[in-house]
């Protein structure tokens, strides 16, 4: 059966609750260069945003940001046991995979995306992964969503995006796709 529809999913907060994974990874990475981050600040200012957006808010310069991000990516898999899977969304994706292309569009790194998908044995469900390294413009820019639609030759009208964050929803709106907002699970 030829597919002509597409489902795009965000990673953090949509497919997985990774708040603790990311918080612990960043907290430990920041500690290595003598910085600290409080949980409430992380939730409000950092989670779901690109590291170059929030790390300057705690006083890091460009070089320090790159060091912290590199350390964070290295530490990420040590905290995967803290992640929670959105089993209902994954069940829906499993039911849809014969009629829809399924792609991940995330601002997370490819390394961290692959690690969590492999940890939960869900990597094979995705026909395409567009990670932070694959785009020039991060969400709220729709580049990642548009790239996925172009890859599969599927129109925005035949695309459904699952997103949780304001920037992700803004990017989905700009792409012209249909949107379902994922709430806490």
Predicted regions and their residues:
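Short, acidic loop-to-helix structural element flanking the phosphoryl-transfer center
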Residues: 78-104, 110, 114, 142
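Conserved SAM-binding loop
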Residues: 15, 102, 137, 161-162
């Amino acid at each position: 059966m030829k597919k002509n529809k597409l489902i795009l999913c965000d990673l953090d907060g949509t497919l997985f609750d990774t708040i603790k994974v990311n918080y612990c990874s960043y907290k430990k990475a920041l500690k290595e260069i003598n910085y600290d981050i409080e949980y409430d600040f992380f939730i409000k200012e950092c989670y779901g945003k690109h590291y170059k957006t929030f790390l300057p808010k705690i006083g890091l310069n460009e070089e320090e940001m790159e060091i912290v991000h590199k350390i964070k990516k290295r530490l990420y898999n040590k905290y995967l046991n803290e992640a929670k899977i959105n089993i209902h969304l994954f069940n829906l994706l499993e039911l849809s995979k014969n009629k829809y292309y399924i792609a991940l569009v995330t601002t997370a790194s490819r390394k961290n995306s692959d690690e969590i998908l492999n940890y939960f044995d869900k990597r094979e469900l995705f026909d395409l992964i567009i990670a932070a390294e694959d785009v020039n413009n991060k969400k709220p820019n729709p580049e990642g969503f548009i790239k996925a639609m172009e890859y599969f030759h599927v129109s925005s009208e035949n695309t459904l995006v699952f997103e949780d964050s304001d920037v992700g929803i803004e990017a989905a709106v700009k792409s012209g796709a249909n949107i379902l907002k994922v709430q806490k699970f």
